[in-house]
């Protein structure tokens, strides 16, 4: 009887470990990317909360006229 309980405990630990590995591999987070070019601003994989929206709203595409070289 003790061997059966020991075997059940090992199986339970293995099943829980496999479930944990699968669930963590399914939850992949991509980094937030804000790409600013001369023509546009692209937002990729970003969580759009109020703070992020306010920050993005003030961005403008890069232009040579606004750049200053000293």
UniProtKB/Swiss-Prot annotation:
Cytoplasmic side: 28-70
Primary location group: host cell
Highest taxon of the lineage: Viruses
Coiled coil: none
GO cellular component: host cell endoplasmic reticulum membrane; membrane
TM spans (from-to): 7-27
Localization (cell): Host endoplasmic reticulum membrane
Lumenal compartment spans: 1-6
Sequence similarity: Belongs to the Tymovirales TGBp3 protein family.
UniProt miscellaneous comment: TGBp1, TGBp2 and TGBp3 seem to act together for cell-to-cell propagation. TGBp1 is the main movement protein that physically cross the plasmodesma with the viral genome. TGBp2 and TGBp3 would facilitate TGBp1 function.
This protein's UniProt keywords: Host endoplasmic reticulum, Host membrane, Membrane, Transmembrane, Transmembrane helix, Transport, Viral movement protein
InterPro entries, alphabetized: TGBp3
Protein known as: Movement protein TGBp3
Function description: Plays a role in viral cell-to-cell propagation, by facilitating genome transport to neighboring plant cells through plasmosdesmata. May induce the formation of granular vesicles derived from the Endoplasmic reticulum, which align on actin filaments.
GO BP term, pick one: transport of virus in host, cell to cell
């Amino acid at each position: 009887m003790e061997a059966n309980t020991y075997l059940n405990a090992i199986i339970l630990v293995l099943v829980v470990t496999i479930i944990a590995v699968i669930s963590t591999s399914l939850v992949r987070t991509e980094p937030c990317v804000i790409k600013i070019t001369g023509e546009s601003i692209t937002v990729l994989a970003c969580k759009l909360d109020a703070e992020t929206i306010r920050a993005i709203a003030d961005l403008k595409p890069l232009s040579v006229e606004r750049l200053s070289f000293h």
